[in-house]
């Protein structure tokens, strides 16, 4: 099975930021879009389209009035849950969550509209408001590269941010499966490889960083090896969060690890269904 998710943002000439997330996978093809004010991030439009589900090409979707007025920022989860209370639409909710993540990442190019006098003031605000949120922000006293050292001084005024997440699963050996996951965006790049047995036992879990704000981030790659020996089909979100999240972890490594393990578990369950 395969899964490819792309998200991006663009600033318009009407004081808006638009965000789009597109998921193309073996199971479905879906698009979500939001438009928000560039200064407040208040959502003004929200629409989605389901173009394919499985082998069925039966478009559905529409506007999401419940999201109008919500802030596309930290704390948006309750609004997303209210907009999509049916568990059957969790995948739609997750697409809008990807749109919000893209808006969040774009703020670094909109700090003037957001009320910050300079990039330094914006960076200082993040230092104060996100203490111990990841290994980077837990060790600001020893990091060698600060945020604007990493991304450079050049502004972006049109296309602001791009992110691609890709997962592929295939048979490995006589009975096992291998999954690869890649996370690539405007600021970060990390990949994972997971091997598991036919019963779901994780035999290998490797992660590699190619780009990150500081080399201290690269050390989080070793955290995922704590999941070796665990069963993919029995892991829950808390297990994965405990491994790669928190003050010594990395949200982006956690993100692609979740996606990769979820796709691997889905493939194992599909094989189990065929064997019954």
Where are these regions (language model features)?
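Active-site- and interface-proximal helix/loop "cap" or "latch" segments in soluble metabolic
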Residues: 2-140, 183-276
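Short, compositionally biased leader-like segments
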Residues: 138-177
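Two-metal-ion RNase H-like nuclease active-site motif
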Residues: 178-182
